[in-house]
Amino acid sequence: MTELKQSIQPIGIFFNAQYPSLEAICQRWGLVFDKEAAFELVFENNCLVLNKRDEPKLKGISVDFVSGAVAHRRKFGGGRGQSIAKAVGLKQGVNPSVVDGTAGLGRDAFVLASLGCNVTMVERNPVVAALLEDGLRRAYESEEIGDWMRERMRLVHGSSLESVAELGEEIDVVYLDPMYPHREKSALVKKEMRVFQSLVGADLDADGLLAPATALATKRVVVKRPDYAEDLDGVKPSMVISTKKNRFDVYVKAAMKA
């Protein structure tokens, strides 16, 4: 399910140390107890949840691949006609292997896996990686989606795409969705995203992702950007697939073949 590729600098987090399962998760991901930490990890209904301690009215953040919005998108989101599917090159007889180099909460990775891609998620923030692993655990146990989730979706915890390159596997597509500062005032930004951004910060080194992504991918690199953002690292893409608020910049290296 999860491969730990390298140690990460410990991050402080608040949790109830009387719960062995929480303590074990924090030890596994290099999270150290900090009573002054802004964030807290808790278990709610067999689900690992991240809460922002100074905003108790905000809903906690968790990863749920089985129900909720991502499940609705899997069932009713348009299948392979979705822009993200076109961007990675999904078509009849072609199910690319994909590395999501900026996994976040795993939603785009899940869409691609549900459409037939084998997806390896890379997440360098250990708190987010812990949430992802918990989401995968519950998805793997699901009667509805468990079988194909175990086959198509996994997590690698590491600080860079080199973590995947070390595995020595051939990767068709590298998918990147770097955190980009919102243009709107903070009150207009979705609350969950605001909390998430305050945890992980902006990807200030995002431009440095394109070169290793291009080296790793054998077929193409796909970069998801807000419609107002500049090209990643100033490099013009081979083609652009636009949606209402975002676009997918596609850097083609070789044709997809069935």
Curated annotation (Swiss-Prot):
A Pfam short name: SAM_MT
Keywords, alphabetical: Cytoplasm, Methyltransferase, rRNA processing, S-adenosyl-L-methionine, Transferase
Keyword rRNA processing included in the entry's annotation: yes
Role according to the record: Specifically methylates the guanosine in position 1516 of 16S rRNA.
Main location: cytoplasm
Protein name (Swiss-Prot/TrEMBL): Ribosomal RNA small subunit methyltransferase J
Alphabetized GO MF terms: rRNA (guanine-N2-)-methyltransferase activity
Catalytic reaction(s) noted: guanosine(1516) in 16S rRNA + S-adenosyl-L-methionine = N(2)-methylguanosine(1516) in 16S rRNA + S-adenosyl-L-homocysteine + H(+)
Gene: rsmJ
Family to which this protein belongs: Belongs to the methyltransferase superfamily. RsmJ family.
Signal peptide: none
UniProt keyword annotation of 4Fe-4S present: no
GO CC, one annotated term: cytoplasm
EC number(s) given by UniProt: 2.1.1.242
Class of this enzyme: transferase
Binding site for S-adenosyl-L-methionine: R107, D108, E123, R124, S159, S160, D177
